[in-house]
UniProtKB/Swiss-Prot annotation:
It is an enzyme of class 5 (isomerase). Belongs to the TrpF family. The gene is TRP1. It holds the Pfam family PRAI. Its EC number is 5.3.1.24. One of its GO terms (biological process) is L-tryptophan biosynthetic process. This is N-(5'-phosphoribosyl)anthranilate isomerase. One of its GO terms (molecular function) is phosphoribosylanthranilate isomerase activity. It catalyses: N-(5-phospho-beta-D-ribosyl)anthranilate = 1-(2-carboxyphenylamino)-1-deoxy-D-ribulose 5-phosphate.
Length: 210
């Protein structure tokens, strides 16, 4: 079954709604200066909400930040996963993070396919996941699903998370694409710039085929 990730959560209420809907991942942006960036107190409240929800893992999203900062926040917030969205050396982070912490590395499709494939091969058995997104990430731009399906079929051993332009209306189709094991949404479950509990529930249900 495909796992749903609700990202860009900015408060404990939205985190709790995502967990209650059955999201496997709840993500918060830890990159300074972004629209969805959370402060320290909000991050702690979100972490507490997710810790109380069995089956939901907390993800911190980072971009080109010092490893020391990422590792500190991983420890302080009890992050179950670290998501890297920049030009980071994923292997260096993997070597420093606890083995139990999932490392998600974002790649732009189709530009970074070779790099994604190289990580997949090098990271076997090391608790890592490829994420395919549009350039910039968080833009709501949809990838070329026909090209992605062809790539996934040609590399059947690669399982990945898909982001970019996902909504409750199209996630069921996205979940059926070859290689997709997780789907990542942010703006697609918002109304007026805020997370919408009904859209979150619909997204998770449609992703899982409920």
């Amino acid at each position: 079954m495909v796992v749903a990730k609700v990202c860009g959560v900015r408060d404990a209420g939205a985190a709790a709604a995502a967990a209650a809907a059955g999201a496997g991942f709840v993500g918060m942006v830890c990159v300074p200066g972004r629209r969805r960036t959370v402060g320290r107190e909000e991050a702690r409240a979100i972490a507490a909400a997710v810790r109380g929800a069995p089956g939901t893992r907390l993800v911190g999203v980072f971009q080109d930040q010092a490893p020391e900062e990422v590792l500190r926040l991983q420890r302080e917030l009890g992050l179950d996963a670290v998501q890297l969205h920049g030009a980071e050396d994923w292997a260096a982070f993997r070597a420093q993070l606890p083995a139990s912490t999932l490392l998600i590395k974002s790649f732009v499709f189709p530009r970074d396919c070779e790099a994604a494939l190289a990580m997949h091969r090098a990271a076997r058995g090391r608790n890592c996941m490829v994420l395919f997104d549009a350039a910039g990430g968080g833009s709501g731009a949809r990838l070329d699903w026909a090209a992605l399906a062809a790539w996934g079929a040609a590399h059947a051993d690669v399982q990945f998370m898909l982001a970019g332009g996902l909504t409750p209306a199209n996630v069921a189709e996205a979940a059926r694409l070859p290689g997709v094991v997780a789907v990542d949404v942010s703006s697609g479950v918002e109304t007026g710039g805020a997370k919408d509990g009904n859209k979150i529930r619909q997204f998770v249900e449609n992703a899982k085929g409920i």
